[in-house]
């Protein structure tokens, strides 16, 4: 059996799922230059912001802490890679924004919140910058994930 068959089937499944569901959301709006939700300008802004506020923990190229997958002695998790090699793509856009604004749950990690430091535009630029490292296959899988996990607060706004 061809070793690539499971990957090909998974990719096909992702593409099929991408075609299902609700109308396009924010992350699905495509920039003509990047083909992604963000533009080149955001990536260019995000690099220096990431270098200033994030690289000390997540690495200069968003590679994360060495052995990011092993708990620290205090039971918390080290900073994970954000470059598409770990689980960042398992978080929808609203959750990535929230994590940067509010920081991690103190029981799980040491990440501080940046709501008082970074504007919403800078937060989006940081996300654009690290997502620019993601392979197209990872980005496509993330789009499906993002579409299937809408921001719960957006549902509340419609009920008010």
Label every model-predicted segment.
Residues 75-88:
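Short microdomains enriched in Cys/His and/or Lys/Arg
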Residues 26-33, 51, 90, 109-160:
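Flexible coil segments in periplasmic/lumen-exposed cytochrome c-class electron-transfer proteins
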Residues 16-19:
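C-terminal motif of bacterial Sec signal peptides marking the signal peptidase cleavage site
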Residues 44-48, 52, 80, 94, ...:
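Solvent-exposed, polar/charged alpha-helical surfaces in well-ordered, non-transmembrane soluble domains
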Residues 1-9:
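Bacterial N-terminal signal peptides that target proteins for export
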Residues 24-26, 40-41, 47-77, 102-110, ...:
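Periplasmic/extracellular electron-transfer cofactor-ligation site
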């Amino acid at each position: 059996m061809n070793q690539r068959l499971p990957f090909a089937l998974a990719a096909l499944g992702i593409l099929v799922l991408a075609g299902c569901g609700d109308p396009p959301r924010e992350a699905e709006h495509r920039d003509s230059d990047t083909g992604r939700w963000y533009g080149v300008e955001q990536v260019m802004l995000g690099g220096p912001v990431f270098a200033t506020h994030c690289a000390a923990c997540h690495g200069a190229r968003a590679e994360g802490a060495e052995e990011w997958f092993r708990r620290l002695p205090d039971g918390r998790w080290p900073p994970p890679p954000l470059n598409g090699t770990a689980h960042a793509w398992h978080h929808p856009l609203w959750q990535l924004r929230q994590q940067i604004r509010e920081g991690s749950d103190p029981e799980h990690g040491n990440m501080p919140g940046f709501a008082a430091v970074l504007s919403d535009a800078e937060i989006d630029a940081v996300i654009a910058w690290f997502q620019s490292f993601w392979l197209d296959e990872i980005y496509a899988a993330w789009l499906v994930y993002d579409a299937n996990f809408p921001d719960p607060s957006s549902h509340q706004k419609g009920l008010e």
